[in-house]
Design a protein with these regions (language model features):
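Short, contiguous pre-domain boundary segments
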Residues: 2-12
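Short, conserved catalytic-motif segment at the N-terminal edge
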Residues: 12-77, 156
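Aromatic- and histidine-enriched alpha-helix N-cap/loop-to-helix transition segments
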Residues: 35, 77-86, 118-121, 168-176
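Active-site helix/loop module of the DD-peptidase/beta-lactamase fold
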Residues: 73, 81-82, 94-138, 156, ...
Length: 188
């Protein structure tokens, strides 16, 4: 473990030559500019090649402010944009398995979603960010990890525009919407 101003980097690297050291230095540089915490891991064949984490679970005004709760391997984080490709890959796998039709209404898989004029919203409209549910209203404060809370709100919520008529990045809701569909299809 090394310590910088008000953060500590916990590092495990199993890479040849200087590669592990360079990755760690870059991580430490980013962490030194951050006011929170972060993790970075690389696995190959189920074995860790790089595992780095450090900083604070709280947002601080400055990277030099004291760390109240250290960032650990177990710290949960909302990835937002980082999940879009993963979620779309899961949808593609469900299509490939023959259990998801992107042209079908979301309500075929998630009946409660048909509320508030959304009965004809398709899975494709969710995938292409045209559904008009760009936020949850009301916002379930401090419930980023509560799929049930978000899916219940999104099922009842009216879109902010006619689905399919506009495109806007569904930064917060994309994962919740498609996770709710996948959960109802697969049961997990």
């Amino acid at each position: 473990m090394t310590t910088g101003s008000a953060h500590a980097v916990v590092a495990e690297t199993h890479l040849p030559g200087t590669t592990g050291r360079v990755i760690r230095e870059i991580f430490e540089q980013h962490l030194g500019n951050a006011c929170g915490g972060m993790s970075f891991s690389v696995y190959r064949g189920g074995e860790p090649l790089v595992r780095l984490h450090g900083g604070s679970q709280e947002r601080r005004a400055s990277a030099d402010d004291p760390v109240e709760t250290p960032w650990t391997d177990e710290t949960l984080a909302v990835m937002f944009s980082g999940t879009k490709g993963l979620v779309a890959t899961v949808a593609a796998m469900l299509v490939d398995d023959g259990v998801l039709d992107v042209n079908a209404p979301v309500a075929r898989y998630w009946p409660e979603f048909a509320a508030a004029g959304k009965e004809n919203v398709t899975v494709a409209q969710v995938l292409n960010h045209t559904v008009g549910l760009i936020y949850t209203d009301p916002d379930p404060t401090d419930s980023f990890f509560d799929l049930t809370a978000h899916s219940e709100i999104l099922a009842r919520q009216k879109p902010v525009w006619e689905p399919g008529s506009k495109v806007a990045y569904h930064a917060v809701t994309f994962g919740y919407l498609l996770e709710a569909v996948a959960l109802r299809i697969t049961g997990k």
